[in-house]
Amino acid sequence: MTKEKFDAIVVGAGMSGNAAAYAMASRGLKVLQLERGEYPGSKNVQGAIMYANMLEAIIPDFRNDAPLERHLVEQRFWIMDDTSHTGMHYRSDDFNEVTPNRYTIIRAQFDKWLSRKVCEAGGTVLCETTATGLEWDSAGKAIGVRTDRAGDVVLADVVVLAEGVNGLLGTRAGLREMPKSKNVALAVKELHFLPEEVIAERFGLTGDEGCVIEAGGTISRGMAGLGFLYTNKESISLGIGCLISNFAETMERPYALLDAFKRHPSIQPLIAGSEVKEYAAHLIPEGGFNAIPRLCGNGWVVVGDAAQLNNAVHREGSNLAMASGRMAGEAISIIKSRGGVMDKASLSLYKTMLDKSFVVEDLSKQKDMPSLLHTNSPNFFTTYPQLISHAAQNFVRVDGTPKIEREIATTAAFLRARSRWGLVSDAVRLASAWR
């Protein structure tokens, strides 16, 4: 391990860590990035959605060589019960633009590519190295990290914590609390391989067009959670995630949940004949605005999942991670160019930039939504999906029963399940949390 001092140390080589490291290295800072995995992305085998405008702000010409799977032209939203789904979808040829807005990616490939860009920009990336603790000076300022390499210490003016939602470095140092189980989801995912032409036929795609399905309902067995399906070039990323607190309360097994989701009559035909080659579990921050910890201090900043920056309502995580990492890197670069000290007062520039961005604005707008869905999960994820399915079937079934009788039966079913006050109360709380 080198003994030289760096301008910045970035702990973690995921979306936020790579964005921060690149932002600083490309501006001439001496950057060391530590990754505990064998290579960046080795612990992220799952698929994901990448939002182009966030990456364009970091690497404008990323489309030239980034490992992109498909650009998304169709979004489907499903409300599922045990045997059916009621859905809506949006598809537009406008998304077949010269510079598409969203892509599916395989994190293992993408993270490795982005880390390579960090190296090309002048950063140093050291893999299979775990940061075990922060190093402090006598004034209480972080001045580096200790590693598992024979207890070695690496010094820097500032440390960027991009260690993920369950990172121990920040919690051990007392910079943040261990996230509460109600604010973290466990997602289990599989990668199903199919020929490219089969995927195109099943989803009505041409070229490198892609489709995303996001689903909620009885598939989560009364827990707050969602299922998802992403189309890649020659594979399908399939998974489901629920709050850890719900798993603890119900004793449901995550993989059993995924297995049932795969066998659902709306999903099974889409993955029939596929070969499963990869399985992964991943923790996702779900607490939203109210769960955001301290973002900066004397000699340190927190970015990405470690800062609970994930928009669960709009299913946005990677773009918030890249945006926060970029802003942290830019703020540190500005402070460095001014000859400033990396103390809490100076590093608050990062928080100011974040507060003025869409990241915090969007999260604060719907700060009450995570709590509402968590405390009312049986209604929103079981009762209403079943009622909606029943209403939809009543609407389309024709068997000689007068329409007025079907309408009365549908209304009665809703009132039996929730009552007038319950329906109005749920609607008001949902609207209030959404605005």
From Swiss-Prot:
SUPFAM superfamilies: FAD-linked reductases, C-terminal domain, FAD/NAD(P)-binding domain. The keyword rRNA-binding does not apply. Its cofactor is FAD. GO terms for biological process: nitrogen fixation. The keyword Flavoprotein applies. One of its GO terms (molecular function) is oxidoreductase activity. InterPro entries: FAD/NAD-bd_sf, FixC-like. Keywords: FAD, Flavoprotein, Nitrogen fixation, Oxidoreductase, Plasmid. Belongs to the ETF-QO/FixC family. Could be required for the formation of a functional nitrogenase Fe protein. Probably accepts electrons from FixA/FixB and reduces a quinone. This is Protein FixC. It comes from Rhizobium meliloti (strain 1021) (Ensifer meliloti).
